[in-house]
């Protein structure tokens, strides 16, 4: 999957979220149509709802997983724990599987790095592909 950084300036409007979602959905259709479809995991808050919607719209049979990366963030020591920590749920084996990791916005990559650290606690995936709704180009 290729994503072009989406830079916004005062003269460039922010793209429509539904349009971005349809583009992402269409990019993922062939990925999940393979004989061995990847596992789908969303990062809590923005990526979890995205994974839930993709799961529904792609008509996937296997459940999707969710990650709460609160304890894996590199700023945990300075910001502390959030009061609304969610449960990580990965109801499938990821060993040697391709994983599609969903998040709503990609900026610095810190959330993705934290998610990768947590995913590796569950096993060694074959690869992790990132599916984001919007790339801020940070």
What residues fall within each predicted segment?
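PRPP-associated nucleotide enzymes
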Residues: 1-138
């Amino acid at each position: 999957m290729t994503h072009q950084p989406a830079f916004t300036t005062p003269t460039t409007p922010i793209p429509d979220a539904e349009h971005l979602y349809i583009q992402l959905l269409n990019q993922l259709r062939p990925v999940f149509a393979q004989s061995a479809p990847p596992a789908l995991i969303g990062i809590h808050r923005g990526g979890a709802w995205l994974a839930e919607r993709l799961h529904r719209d792609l008509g996937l049979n296997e459940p999707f997983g969710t990650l709460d990366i609160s304890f894996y963030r590199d700023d945990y020591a300075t910001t502390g724990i959030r009061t609304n920590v969610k449960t990580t749920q990965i109801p499938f084996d990821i060993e040697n599987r391709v994983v599609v990791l969903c998040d709503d916005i990609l900026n610095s990559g810190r959330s993705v790095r934290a998610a990768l650290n947590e995913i590796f606690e569950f096993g060694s995936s074959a690869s992790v592909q990132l599916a984001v709704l919007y790339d801020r180009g940070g």
